[in-house]
Every structure is written in structure tokens, then in C-alpha cells.
Amino acid sequence: MRRNIIAVKTRPGEVRFVAVASIERVEAFGNYVKIYFGNERVLHRATLSDMEYILDDRFIRIHRSHIVKRDHLRKLLSELGRYQEVELADETVLPLGGNYKRQLMLELGL
């Protein structure tokens, strides 16, 4: 189910509401995910698959541990002619998983 807001328990007795539009990326972190937005990040008890279901088509999974907002992608980085990493708008470099590379390339028209 696509949502506009995600309710995140940040600590006992506190729930934070995060606008999906503000999310830049999501990273798997054990039984949790780290949600990155602006200069902040919060832990949320969910799987990356749960987040794929919640997030809309502005997001794409690039690795078994990473989902990123499409408009946050800046560069594909290659080594020996094979794209293996992506650089985000904030200059973070993330791995590009083989299982997700083809879909990303198709969506980018490459």
C-alpha cells in the first residue's frame, strides 16, 4: 500500500511522521531499515521488501540493501567498463547489485 507518510517509532513513547516525499534513500540494517531524509536518518522496524511495497515509483531498488529515490541518482560509476556503483546527489556512493542493474539500466534507457 503506497503511503504519503510513514509512522516511525523513534524511541519508546515517541512516533515520528516522515513524509515519503522527503525520503532520499533507505538502507537495510539488520531487522530494521535506516531511512535517510535531508540531514537526518531514523531507524524503522521493517524490511527493505516492506519499504518497496510502501514507497511509490519515485524509488528504485539498486542493491539487496539499498532503495534510492530516482531523482537523487547522479552518476553511474564503472570499473573496467562494468557499472558497479551509483553516486547520489549528496555524493554518497552505493553498490549497484547485479540483480538490480538490468532494471536500472532499462529505466534509464541505457
Regions found by a protein language model. Give the residues of each.
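Conserved binding/recognition cores within well-folded domains
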Residues: 1-89
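C-terminal structural segments of small proteins and small subunits
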Residues: 82-102
